[in-house]
Amino acid sequence: MNESERKIVEEFQKKTGINFKNEELLFRALCHSSYANEQNQAGRKDVESNEKLEFLGDAVLELFVCEILYKKYPEAEVGDLARAKSAAASEEVLAMVSRELNLGKFLFLGKGEEKTGGRDRDSILADAFEALLAAIYLDQGYHKIKELFEEEFELYIEKIMRGEMLFDYKTALQEIVQSEHKVPPEYVLVRTEKNDGDRIFVVEVRVDGKSIAMGRGRTKKEAEKEAARIAYEKLLKERS
């Protein structure tokens, strides 16, 4: 880590209260592949992306969620538990948890990802949270993950088991728009972009032909969901 990177790592720990014995693990968890690629091309060999940590974190998350489900819902059918596990470990939930941590603020992103709104993209936030879980697991063990996140995930899982999750931004936006404008929102693919070799879809959500928000994603569906989320939050803010 260089000095500017170390400051961000230290600020993350200060703001979240999640302290690391090995700060290099935290730094790696916060490094998106776009940033690692840029730094590697610039000659730095000490910067590794969070992809391997994400791989481990996916397994840690699955165990963590399954343990909560197994202990709290002993009478539930296996099929219901499996569906709840998928929902609790979904991109949407992980992105919500990441936003509560303000994780996006501390991510190291390449210039392209920064420019295209990667800091608030669900997929990047969800992947980074999985990487963070792995870093915590390696640094302090499984018990620390339970200490930090068990209560929060129990609340999400309770909502899921009651059928209250997941929050569907497209449906929520449609309800608001149709109640006020009597027409559904329209999703329009406006362009595709290249970012570190990846194809990024850019979708605009329109009401009565007027653009109200734009979203980006690795698939058209992901971009539509992101556009719906931004539009929904914007309309709620305007109402308040």
Swiss-Prot record:
One of its GO terms (cellular component) is cytoplasm. The active site is at D58, E130. It is an enzyme of class 3 (hydrolase). SUPFAM superfamilies: dsRNA-binding domain-like, RNase III domain-like. It is found in: Cytoplasm. Its cofactor is Mg(2+). It catalyses: Endonucleolytic cleavage to 5'-phosphomonoester. Its EC number is 3.1.26.3. GO terms for molecular function: double-stranded RNA binding; metal ion binding; ribonuclease III activity; rRNA binding. Residues 168-237 form the DRBM domain. GO terms for biological process: mRNA processing; regulation of gene expression; rRNA processing; tRNA processing. Pfam families: dsrm (PF00035), Ribonucleas_3_3 (PF14622). Keywords: Cytoplasm, Endonuclease, Hydrolase, Magnesium, Metal-binding, mRNA processing, Nuclease, RNA-binding, rRNA processing, rRNA-binding, tRNA processing. Residues 9-141 form the RNase III domain. Mg(2+) binds at E54, D127, E130. Homodimer. Digests double-stranded RNA. Involved in the processing of primary rRNA transcript to yield the immediate precursors to the large and small rRNAs (23S and 16S). Processes some mRNAs, and tRNAs when they are encoded in the rRNA operon. Processes pre-crRNA and tracrRNA of type II CRISPR loci if present in the organism. Belongs to the ribonuclease III family. This is Ribonuclease 3.
